[in-house]
């Protein structure tokens, strides 16, 4: 915890507006997330009472080790629904979820009453480019369960698997799709 505490203090000192902790196991082991994981995640943000610093967590569902891999392990589809209420009741301001590489039943979004959701709409390990129309449809699907002010569009995760030109194309389409809202 000393390393996390040191990093947290540096972020506060440097006036970071956002502090994000990636969480690789909550979606794979939701029972552990509920039993002790979320409490430990909150400890990462201990003493950040400054309202100008947004506390974010990314809940990873799993990604392949190369572009366009098909059969690789992913977290169970019901994972987000098992932990959404507890995350909303935590001190986390924003939860980042992955939806593009495996569509979720978005009913769990209604559990987020106070927490914002970064909604993954672009596959980060696929060379297939999402259409503007499919992104718009998925945003509309999400807005059936969560207020527009709480929804932030984004790629599923980091863009490290994608060549730079492809990443730019995907992001441009995502921005165009989201600008219609």
PLM feature spans:
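Single conserved hydrophobic/aromatic residue that forms the stacking wall/gate
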Residues: 1-12
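Alpha-helix-loop-beta-strand connector modules within alpha/beta enzyme cores
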Residues: 6, 33-53, 111-117, 173-181
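Active-site mouth loops of central-metabolism enzymes
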Residues: 6, 66-78, 126-132
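Short beta-strand segments at enzyme active-site cores
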Residues: 13-23, 54-59, 97, 150-155
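Active-site-proximal loop/short-helix segments
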Residues: 15-37, 58-67
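Flexible glycine/acidic-rich beta-alpha junction loops that bind and position SAM and/or redox cofactors
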Residues: 27, 59-70, 101-107, 160-164
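Distinct, well-ordered alpha-helical segments
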Residues: 30-38, 68-76, 105-112
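Catalytic-face loop-and-helix region of soluble metabolic enzyme cores
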Residues: 79-181
């Amino acid at each position: 915890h000393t390393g996390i505490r040191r990093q947290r203090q540096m972020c506060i000192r440097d006036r970071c507006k956002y502090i994000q902790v990636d969480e690789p196991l909550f979606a794979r082991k939701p029972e552990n997330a509920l039993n002790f994981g979320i409490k430990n995640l909150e400890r990462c943000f201990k003493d950040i009472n400054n309202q100008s610093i947004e506390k974010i967590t990314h809940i990873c569902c799993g990604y392949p080790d190369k572009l366009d891999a098909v059969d690789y392990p992913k977290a169970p589809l019901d994972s987000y629904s098992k932990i959404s209420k507890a995350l909303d009741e935590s001190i986390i301001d924003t939860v980042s979820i992955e939806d593009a590489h495996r569509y979720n039943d978005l009913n769990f979004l209604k559990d987020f009453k106070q927490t914002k959701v970064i909604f993954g709409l672009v596959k980060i390990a696929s060379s297939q480019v999402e259409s503007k129309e499919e992104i718009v449809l998925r945003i509309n699907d999400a807005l059936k369960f969560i207020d527009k002010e709480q929804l932030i569009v984004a790629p599923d995760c980091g863009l490290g698997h994608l060549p730079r030109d492809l990443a730019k194309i995907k992001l441009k389409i995502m921005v165009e799709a989201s600008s219609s809202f």
